[in-house]
From Swiss-Prot:
Belongs to the MINDY deubiquitinase family. FAM188 subfamily. One of its GO terms (biological process) is protein K48-linked deubiquitination. It comes from Homo sapiens (Human). One of its GO terms (molecular function) is cysteine-type deubiquitinase activity. InterPro entries: MINDY-3/4_CD, MINY3/4. Residues 41-76 are annotated as: Disordered. This is Inactive ubiquitin carboxyl-terminal hydrolase MINDY-4B.
Length: 460
């Protein structure tokens, strides 16, 4: 009898615990939904623009999946990992975003007005490695959709530091020894240059977050408590835009700044909706694409950063599609180029092959898409692509953006080696070297190249 009473008491206690656990889970669910749509209003973490940023959600895909209104979800461990955005005064002199502008912005990005940027997009910003380190000139990049934008901007940062800033020689030492101030100047110059090119060298538009809200929720528009607080600032001179960005750089490089989203917004408004409609074609009606439960940037976004025009394709000029529709490619050579290689790509698909406009840029810097991962290749010799003799034997430097990479990788490219020398080189390092994706990407530009990793074990 005593055992039966004891068992009943234990069973009752177990049911009570299960009920409590169920209620806690229920409350946690709604707390996460509420926090997601308020951009973390319970967030009490102060901004720390110089400290380390540790992701509280290492297992999330990070590609930018957003949820329809009322269904946003973030892991509870990530609720306090993003500080509030850097907010400027509403009296700074810009003009506020309207409901019509916010609606068009959502439509051109997602194809609807319901989706919003998720946690991993919101936490993405422009942060350099430590000054005076070997990777001082490189950005720390995350995973997912924002990564491609960060790496594309990285190309423009290298362009500024190596080739366009005044008073500095084009050598690797100047890259690796830059100070914090030089990092900030490089980022401001890179962002301003990209926006100016997108504005057809006529106007740049910069978006910043203010303290006031200008757009209310409607049945057709879901608020995110971020986009609705934008002010837009227009500049008719590139230098003025660069100074403004430099003066408000914390809005792009500060932890919690949503810096990558702000830059993407600025890019779209600089290009204008009218120009974007002319740039795009029937294959691309929106700038972000669903992928593996998230959102990634379409080629049009990368081409807009590289060339100023949101061309949806990588071939030269215009081509005719399968249904005789006109497809838009790249019209002019850009300063920073583009290479791509994928293990599943078909060499017979001419529309997917990168054209010479992107393969042979004005400067020896390339954004690389290798099996869907973005990286940078560059050469410190400005004459590489303008003097054919320079292309016989030269060095390229490779930055993968992976946290495991602690220093630049120097690759020596030999385009005139004999076939038996190339075979011997490949056999020496085994089949892993022979099929390195990095090498395959390089060979889309220099097809017969022998590539020496100079002691580094081939990776990527």
């Amino acid at each position: 009898m005593d055992m039966e009473v004891l068992g009943q008491e234990q069973s009752s206690e177990q049911l009570d615990l299960e009920e409590i656990s169920r209620k806690i889970s229920f409350l946690d669910k709604w707390r996460e939904i509420f926090s997601y749509h308020r951009l973390g209003t319970n967030n009490s973490t102060p901004q720390n623009h110089e400290g380390n940023h540790t992701s509280a959600d290492e297992n999330e895909d990070g590609t930018g999946l957003s949820q329809p209104k009322g269904q946003g979800h973030l892991p509870s461990s990530g609720l306090c990992s993003i500080p509030n955005p850097s907010i400027i005064s509403s009296k700074l002199g810009g003009f506020p975003i309207s409901l019509a502008m916010a609606t068009k912005l959502r439509q051109i990005l997602f194809g609807n007005t319901v989706h919003v940027f998720s946690y991993n997009w919101k936490k993405a910003y422009f942060r350099f490695h430590d000054p005076s380190s070997e990777l001082a000139f490189t950005l720390e990049v995350g995973k997912g959709g924002a990564r491609s934008i960060q790496m594309a901007v990285q190309g423009s940062i290298i362009k500024y530091l190596l080739f366009t800033r005044k008073g500095k020689d084009c050598n690797l030492g100047n890259l690796c020894e830059i100070s914090k101030k030089e990092q900030e100047q490089a980022l401001a110059a890179a962002l301003a240059g990209i926006l100016w090119a997108a504005g057809a060298a006529q106007k740049a538009t910069i978006c910043l977050v203010t303290e006031d809200i200008y757009v209310a929720s409607t049945p057709d528009y879901s608020v995110d408590n971020f986009t609705e607080r934008l002010q837009l600032f227009e500049f008719l001179e590139k230098e003025a835009a660069e100074k403004f960005i430099y003066d408000h750089l914390l809005c792009f490089r500060g932890e919690g700044s949503h810096g990558v989203i702000l830059f993407l917004y600025s890019l779209i408004f600089s290009r204008t909706f009218e120009r974007l409609q002319m740039d795009l074609d029937v294959t691309t009606t929106q700038l972000l694409q669903p992928n593996a439960g998230g959102f990634l940037c379409r080629q049009a976004v990368l081409n807009m950063i590289l060339t100023g025009r949101a061309s949806p394709n990588v071939f030269n000029g215009c081509e005719e599609g399968k249904s005789q529709e006109t497809l838009h490619g790249v019209l002019t050579r850009s300063d920073v180029g583009y290479l791509q290689w994928g293990k599943d790509a078909s060499e017979d698909d001419r529309l997917s092959q990168v054209g010479s406009m992107l393969k042979t840029p004005k400067l020896p810097i390339w954004l690389c898409n290798i099996n869907g991962n973005y990286s940078i290749l560059f050469c410190t010799n400005r004459q590489l692509l303008s003097d054919w003799k320079m292309e016989r034997l030269f060095d390229l430097y490779f930055y993968s953006g992976q946290p495991s990479q602690k220093k630049l990788v120097r690759l020596t490219i030999d385009t005139h080696s004999h076939h038996w020398e190339r075979d011997q080189q490949e056999e020496k390092h085994g089949p892993r070297r022979r099929f390195s994706p990095v090498e395959m990407a390089i060979r889309t530009k220099w097809s017969e190249a022998t590539i020496n990793w100079n002691g580094t074990v081939p990776f990527f």
